[in-house]
Amino acid sequence: MSDSQFLTAHGRFEAARRLPRLDPGHPAHGLHGHGFQARVRVPAHALPARPGAGVQELREGLSQALRPLQYADLNRLLAHPDDAALAQWLRERLGTASAQAAVELRSTPAQGVAGDPGGPWLSLRRHRFLAAHYLPNVPPGHKCGRMHGHGFEVELRAAGVDHATLDAHWAPLASRLDHVLLNDIEGLHNPTSEVLAAWIWERLRPGLDSLHSVSVLETGSSGARFDGSDYEIWKEFGLDSAVRVRRAAAGSPPARLHGQTFRLRLCLSAPLDRVLGWVVDFGDVKTLFRPLFDRLDHRPLYEIEGLDDTDTATLADWIFQACRAELPQLSGLRLLESDGCGAGVHVGAATPP
């Protein structure tokens, strides 16, 4: 399968709105406000930017599109400015990239919408529960074999339903999962993130046929997603590096020696191990990535042999190719700069990170 490169940008805006189509007693019917967050993703070829400047061009395009929304009364722009209407409004203002742009808009960290080009808007809702667990099938001495626990987060995505509907479907499961030992629940004898995501899917899908995916986050840097057929996990790493973009315009800030704090997400997809119940052990991902991590973290990246340049898109592709031998399950990666903008790669039809 071919690899596809993409660019991504992130932005924020503060705005007020009323949602008049909701029942008068609904809290969002009246005037209120949010700190919105928006993320867009486009294929790298969708922007006619000079080499090495794609991330900056998308960043500037998103910033310009968001400018009319900053500190605005959104009802002056849209009659019913819910998350989906705002996301569609934003997509239409991304210039040449609009037709190929995937957009995610969150009105709060726990709710929003996401949509790929030509697809429906998916409502997304995130819930949290506190639970203990242990993994009985790991090798002796593995830390996950000990009794421990997490503040788990679960993100549900579904088409054609609102956030209240997702909440209603989630509520019965929340009461079963919160403040318990997961291993005591039928079907969760070996409660890995992947097994838990599939367990939740199996209980929600019969009553929610538009369910798109279930993601389970054990920590802020790792998680698993199940869409009814495929499993994917991710593990994130922080990199602090020195960069200098050789192809940038002479005298411009990117051309100068400077620093960058990157956030790298590695995504891996494979059938579950029947005994261990995971795609790959998160700890193994960390161990196998460690030699490459040591070449990137607290290093001058412009000195790496074989790395053509240190712009984020070039660097993301180089890391992807460098990882494949040790991590054959790699399905994609995303490399973000300090402000949340960046680039990535995904394999074939795999969901971009």
Predicted regions and their residues:
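Charge-rich, low-complexity N-terminal segments
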Residues: 1-353
